[in-house]
Amino acid sequence: MDENFIKKEFDATKWDEIKPFAKELLERRLNCANCIETLIADASELGEHISEAGALLYIDMTCNTEDIDKKNAFLEFSTNVRPKLSEFSDKLNRKIIDHPKLDNLPERYNLIIKSIRTDIEIFRKENIPLSVRQTELVTESQSINGSMTVVFDGKERTLPEMNVYLESKNRIERAAAWKKISDRRMEDHERLTEIFEELI
């Protein structure tokens, strides 16, 4: 591909900014096998932008578990953008597979086409809300676990910071650290159990 499909900066975490690109891909006329190749390449380029944006939101959230704005930004992406992307991807996949010149594509596209066919087979629109709910629950669980702290040895510490005390050669110190961690986990045990049971 001589030039990029996306020629301007855009916020790939917002559906309103993704939508024009998605619309163009879905409505593009495909008059030749080469046109299908370009469509696949352009869709891949768009997907890379969105995947990178989503990954950065996730990293920001997990590195700042007590930052409500970062958590909400990730949840907004997961509950508003990803469901629409799922439907868009399915429509685009069917557009590609249904094209009469699909068999004229070079052999190097065989694995891509096989993957697209598999995606079409497993896609179920009714599963989208379930996936959204799963993300919400996992995010809540991560937020709860990430915000857990205890006061130990005169200082407030996160649970990962307590691991060093669990490896202490001093048996009394190890036991005290274990009890602190256990007691703190019990404070959120009920909600975490509810989340786990809903996930399974």
Predicted regions and their residues:
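A well-structured
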Residues: M1-I200
